[in-house]
UniProtKB/Swiss-Prot annotation:
Main subcellular localisation: membrane
EC number: 7.3.2.1
Pfam family, one: ABC_tran
Classification lineage: Bacteria, Bacillati, Mycoplasmatota, Mycoplasmoidales, Mycoplasmoidaceae
The name this protein goes by in its record: Phosphate import ATP-binding protein PstB
Subcellular location: Cell membrane
Length: 329
């Protein structure tokens, strides 16, 4: 892996020099814009001020690209991890900070639970891992997220590649209003695979992996919305794993399901960890204990404690962790 990282860094040197050059230009342009705004009238020049502020926002987004050696390729990245997060902060609406100085590792082929009260930052954090939050306007961040040794915010890995490698299953059941088959085949074609036999096999394998094939193999052209809740969630999982991601993110995947469907999904998640690293947001302490290997406790946008699930629930090191898992807070 060390040789691969060195090769990646060498190939990226020229690109970095270009980034540094353009970053200086962007920063200079922002200074000029800010000087111009100070000379404008808020009432009579409102449209021009708005235009300039939009330009500044665009330039600030471009400046997000990092320009130093250490935060593009992490040479000391631990091969036991898939993610290493360092000094990460995140804001909505530019000034509403919701994540504070996050430092943690997510281990390969483990099921890691993110726990904590509603609004503590769990769902925001999990969406940072494949940059879904970047699809929203007026967000910003500082710090570094390394995926398999590469900084996802450096430009070395594009967003489409990242989201293919880091799949997502949402809390709300989200099957497309297509057939069962097309729910999976649609994304396969979008990634440039058009051979009919290849698509058929990928769909079949995804449904098998999601423990759904035997239930739907004779009705693949049935509308996905006619499936039960548990079947719909397994279809969403099949869709997420069809292109063989490294990581599967799950944001409360069983919160909308009954106990029988929940048991089915939990069993599936445990089976999937043989192939994928899984990160799951959950409010269920019982579920965390049943199926996860690692647990990270969030409170008020901060990581309070990280450890094995057994350690967190039997010998928590922090009083806040103990209060939460015991139901006192």
């Amino acid at each position: 892996m060390e040789k691969n990282i060195k090769a990646l860094w060498k190939n990226f040197q020229l690109k970095l020099e270009k980034i540094k050059h353009y970053r200086k230009l962007y920063e200079q342009q922002i200074k000029e814009y800010k000087k111009k705004i100070t000379g404008l009238n808020n009432e009579t020049d409102a449209n021009e001020i708005s235009r300039i502020k939009n330009e500044i926002e665009i330039l600030n987004r471009l400046i997000k690209i990092k320009n130093t050696k250490d935060n593009v390729i992490k040479k000391d990245f631990d091969e036991k991890n898939v993610f290493e997060i360092r000094n990460f902060n995140f804001w909505y609406n530019k000034n509403k900070q919701v994540l504070f100085d996050i430092n943690l590792d997510i281990k390969r082929n483990k099921i890691t639970a993110l726990i904590g009260k509603s609004g503590c930052g769990k769902s925001t954090f999990i969406r940072c891992l494949n940059k879904l939050n970047d699809l929203n306007e007026n967000t910003r961040w500082t710090g570094d997220i390394y995926f398999l040794g590469k900084n996802i915010n450096s430009g070395i890995i594009n967003d489409l590649t990242l989201r293919t490698s880091v799949g997502m299953v949402f809390q709300k059941l989200t099957p497309f209003n297509f057939s069962i088959f097309e729910n999976i085949a649609y994304g396969i074609r979008a990634h440039g695979i058009h051979n009919k036999n290849a698509i058929n096999e990928i769909v079949r394998q995804a449904l098998i992996s999601a423990a759904l094939w035997d239930e739907v193999k004779d009705n693949l052209h049935r509308n996905a919305n006619t499936l039960s809740g548990g079947q719909q969630q397994r279809l969403c999982i099949a869709r997420a794993i069809a292109l063989q991601p490294d990581v599967l993110l799950m944001d409360e995947p069983t919160s909308a399901l009954d106990s029988i469907a929940t048991n089915s999904i939990e069993l599936l998640i445990q089976q999937l960890k043989e192939k994928f690293t899984i990160v799951i947001v959950t409010h269920s302490m019982a579920q965390t204990i049943r199926i996860t290997d690692e647990t990270i406790f969030f409170a008020d946008g901060r990581v309070i404690e990280q450890g094995t699930t057994k350690q967190i629930f039997t010998k928590p090191k922090q009083k806040a962790t103990n209060s939460y898992i015991s139901g006192k807070n």
